[in-house]
Amino acid sequence: MSRNFSNEQFSVNLEEQPGCVVSAEVKTTPQLLDKLHKQAIKKIKKDVILPGFRKGKAPDGIIVSRYPSQVTKELNQLLIQSAYQALASVGDRRPLSPQAIKSTSVTKADINEGGQVNFTYEAFPTISDIPWDKLSLSEEPAVKDITDEEMEKGLQNISYFFATKTPVTRTSQEGDFISLSLHVSKQNEEGVPTPIFENKYFKLCEEEMTDAFKTKFLGISAGHRVTEIIASPEIQSFLNGDVLTFTVNAVIEVVAPELDDDKARQLQAESLEDLKKKLRIQLENQAKDRQHQQCFAEAENALASIIDFDLPTSMLEDRLAMLTRAKLLNARLIQYCSDEELENKKSDLLKEAELEAKKTLKLFFLANKIFNDEKLVISREELQYMMDVCSRERYGMQPPRDISKEALQELVMAARDRLTYHKAMEKVLAKAKESATAPSA
């Protein structure tokens, strides 16, 4: 079904297709095209020097007769720019971005009849009003008390600050740390292997690695190498290679001392008991943060379930490709699945990636709608703080001094997107609480 929009200068006809694809026919009045034609002539002739005329002062008629192709080309560009702007200002399905234009064609540029440009592009999705009355969240659970086991583990982690770390020549055993490097290469090809990571430290314990990964590196010594052939075509494609080589750079024995009052004072505590109190407060705050994140995740799921709309195909495909890559690489390199195990898991992983891609993209657009509908704002201080966070994630603690304008703009956009999403989801939580406490009719 086509829809039409118009004003004094443009008429826009839209044909909508699945995947937020829109075919648009934009027509201009003869008066506007005449104005654009004069602008095109003016731009061409400003650099033209003809005998008997000063630079840029030749009559329009001479310019048109001598440079017809240049004038036509410039006119078409101006017509396309004007028609593109009309998609948003006159029509109601604006393109996602200039890069979302799939095809553009000027089908008419006649001074007497006007101009016409046809576009095919991906548009922002059309989202109806959010049915807040359908939003329902479970009752927020009480924060669990900190257990003795959690306190003991926290104190043990603190004790590592004072630990002695000694590279040893013996074989590795449970509780040791190992320094690993991982490189990828291609069979039967010479060349320098590509590093995936270098000198990364792992603790040989079940809390920090899978049993399969740990088993590979128990009972080995520094200099040991583990080489694997990758059979999975997807993993080969992602890594641009089919041979994984793990190199054990060092086996490190870590001995942590007992904590006492003296060591507690070195950590800005008055005593060991004071350190334990501060640790408990820290663990309680972490527990509150985890609980809030659980509520946040529940709000995301609830919001995504109460409304549905069409998603832009290319954005969905890009997000699906990214998540598929991440899940398969995580299974192969982090969970350390064999090629056979990965093949058995692949179907489930692909389904997970598809569901996650749809949900996260849907939430991205919903968050922007909520942010605008609720008239939420981002303060300068909030933006600066989040830019610092994004900068540390990208560059570490010492960002480059000569950061480019493009990189700075990317940081601003990343920070703004993150804050927009967070504020929108906080609003979802607030609305859910309001709904839960409102008296029933």
UniProtKB/Swiss-Prot annotation:
Keywords: Cell cycle, Cell division, Chaperone, Cytoplasm, Isomerase, Rotamase
Pfam families: Trigger_C, Trigger_N
Group of enzyme by EC: isomerase
Domain PPIase FKBP-type intervals: 175-257
InterPro entries per record: PPIase_dom_sf, Trig_fac, Trigger_fac_C, Trigger_fac_C_sf, Trigger_fac_ribosome-bd_bac, Trigger_fac_ribosome-bd_sf, Trigger_fact/SurA_dom_sf
Main location: cytoplasm
Subcellular location: Cytoplasm
Gene Ontology molecular function, alphabetical: peptidyl-prolyl cis-trans isomerase activity
UniProt-listed GO biological process terms: cell division; protein folding; protein transport
Documented EC number(s): 5.2.1.8
Domain of life the protein comes from: Bacteria
Described function: Involved in protein export. Acts as a chaperone by maintaining the newly synthesized protein in an open conformation. Functions as a peptidyl-prolyl cis-trans isomerase.
Domain-level remarks: Consists of 3 domains; the N-terminus binds the ribosome, the middle domain has PPIase activity, while the C-terminus has intrinsic chaperone activity on its own.
UniProt similarity note: Belongs to the FKBP-type PPIase family. Tig subfamily.
Name of the protein: Trigger factor
Gene name for this UniProt entry: tig
